Regions:
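Low-complexity, glycine- and small/polar-enriched segments
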Residues: 1-280
Length: 280
């Protein structure tokens, strides 16, 4: 994995044996980019193994917890406890957005992530949004809460949320559709074609959208080993597959996925016709 990353990002042409030495010679900022990539990949794999009956670690969060312990150990090199604090709170129109590609990663190892608070409805640009291709990856020690805001990939890309000790709640945002200009093919002077990322971003909650066939579907992974996953009133919409691993899942009927669903309890449907016949 390191070799491929170095070749893609830096054009590394050396051997696999020399890859580590090359990596250690990079600036600390670049080393952290790769470390975060590996970290979130491990969290995602650990969450999926939990619901994979063919995995040796089915029903276990061991892989993810080992990754967390590696990046955020409880003690320093001298054996002294490490105290971490801090919560990310996004008020009103605040948020993080990328245009024309680029992912979003947030780490709150000492607190919670609050994306939008209750009260005045925020604008559609608030929350965590990728408006080109790009993933959203979130780790929080405590809960990940959406008030009236959103976490969305609107033009391809997946969403990963791991709450180590808290809940994941998609909030109470409105589902009212807000229509925008559909994506258009844009041609430059050389005849190259790009797609405009200004796509419909309707409603709130958690969603991966693929508004046109050219856009790949995005998967969603929600992991809360000690908490509850709740789509709330805003709901969770997934253009690809969804994997949920949590102590409890509620309001499962408000989770919509076009692909495969894992870890979501089956919603019992009431046979209205049978009830009507019985009461006749």
């Amino acid at each position: 994995e390191l070799l491929n990353w170095l070749q893609t990002r830096f054009g590394y042409t050396g051997t696999q044996d020399g890859a580590l030495a090359f990596y250690l010679g990079l600036p600390a900022e670049q080393q952290r980019v790769f470390a975060r990539s590996v970290y979130f990949n491990e969290l995602q794999a650990g969450g999926r193994e939990y619901n994979d009956p063919t995995s040796r670690r089915v029903g276990s969060y061991l892989r993810g917890r080992q990754a967390i312990a590696s990046l955020f150990p409880d003690k320093d090199a001298q054996g002294r406890p490490i105290q971490r604090d801090g919560t990310i709170t996004m008020f009103g129109p605040s948020g993080i957005r990328t245009d024309f590609g680029g992912g979003i990663q947030t780490l709150t190892p000492g607190g919670k992530l609050i994306v939008g608070v209750e009260g005045q409805v925020p604008p559609v640009t608030s929350g965590l949004l990728t408006q080109g291709s790009g993933d959203i990856q979130i780790y929080s020690k405590d809960s990940v809460l959406l008030g009236l805001s959103r976490i969305m990939t609107t033009f391809g890309g997946g969403i990963l949320v791991w709450s180590a000790e808290g809940d994941i709640n998609a909030g109470r945002g409105s589902k009212t559709s807000l229509l925008y200009t559909p994506p258009l093919r844009v041609y430059d002077n050389a005849g190259n074609v790009t797609l405009s990322p200004q796509v419909p971003s309707s409603g709130a909650g958690i969603a991966t959208l693929n508004p046109i066939p050219e856009v790949p579907r995005g998967d969603v992974d929600l992991i809360a080993p000690l908490g509850t996953v709740d789509p709330g009133e805003a709901g969770i919409r997934v253009s690809g597959d969804i994997n949920v691993a949590a102590l409890r899942v509620v309001n499962a009927a408000n989770i919509q996925a076009q692909g495969e669903s894992r870890g979501i309890p089956t919603v019992a449907l009431v046979n209205v016709s049978a009830l009507s016949s019985a009461s006749a």
